[in-house]
Amino acid sequence: MQVARIMGFDIEIAPRANLIRTDQHVAYGIIAQATHSQLARLYSHAKDVLGEVYLPEAVNVQTVDGKWIPAMTYLCPEMEPRQADEEYVERIAAPALKFGFPSWYIDRIDSFRPSRAQSRKG
């Protein structure tokens, strides 16, 4: 797995992780390979159990060494905004820390924790 960033997107976790288009931000993630059946299982779970529909989108991402590569991301075009669950945010924040995402980006992820939600609104 490899760390990469995608320009023109910001992360939002409300209640699940999603990328939102913006001309002022960058989002970080992991490049991973998955089979069609693995992706189908993952996004069927998102739809059937969690109630969210994620759609594939081709993008170009930049690795930490500056190399641009084509990738697929999955976006949820219609997510009803709700408070994220503390454990869910932790499942995103822990790997971000492990893979060495920038500290400001980990702070951004942490800002979606229920314990920090009030400070984000104010």
Please give the residue ranges for each predicted region.
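Glycine-aromatic micro-motifs
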Residues: 1-122
